[in-house]
């Protein structure tokens, strides 16, 4: 059985299409390992959407976030990424940039 990492449901299409290839998490949600296989589930209802493999984990501070991080998150602009990160993690400056690839897609 695989562990589950959750994403907001609105990100499902972007993940499954390969447009979103990374996620930014704080320390409390950074316990994953490179090479680990995870079920990617929706945050709202814990529905499995696909299986992913963790490719890399990079420690990054909020001020070090750049356009490459935004692009991997499927966002065109850095300011959008920083706004979203601040909404989710209002006080965290220590973050983890987790790159992944979709391995299998669950068809309903």
Swiss-Prot record:
It comes from the Bacteria. Residues 5-102 form the ASCH domain. SUPFAM superfamilies: PUA domain-like. Keywords: Hydrolase. The active site is at 20 (proton acceptor), 23 (nucleophile), 73 (proton donor). It catalyses: N(4)-acetylcytidine + H2O = cytidine + acetate + H(+); N(4)-acetyl-2'-deoxycytidine + H2O = 2'-deoxycytidine + acetate + H(+); N(4)-acetylcytosine + H2O = cytosine + acetate + H(+). CDD domains: ASCH_yqfb_like. Coiled coil: none annotated. Its EC number is 3.5.1.135. GO terms for cellular component: cytosol. The keyword Hydrolase applies. GO terms for molecular function: hydrolase activity, acting on carbon-nitrogen (but not peptide) bonds, in linear amidines; N4-acetylcytidine amidohydrolase activity. The keyword Cytoplasm does not apply. Belongs to the N(4)-acetylcytidine amidohydrolase family. Catalyzes the hydrolysis of N(4)-acetylcytidine (ac4C). This is N(4)-acetylcytidine amidohydrolase.
């Amino acid at each position: 059985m695989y562990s589950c990492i959750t994403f907001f449901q609105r990100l499902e299409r972007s993940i499954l299409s390969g447009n979103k290839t990374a996620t930014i998490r704080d320390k409390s949600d950074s316990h994953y390992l490179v090479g680990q296989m995870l079920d990617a589930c929706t945050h709202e209802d814990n529905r499995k959407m696909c299986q992913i493999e963790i490719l890399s984990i990079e420690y990054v501070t909020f001020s070090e976030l750049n356009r490459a991080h935004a692009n991997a998150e499927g966002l065109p602009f850095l300011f959008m990424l920083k706004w979203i990160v601040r909404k989710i993690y209002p006080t965290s400056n220590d973050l983890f940039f987790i790159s992944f690839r979709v391995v299998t897609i669950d068809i309903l």
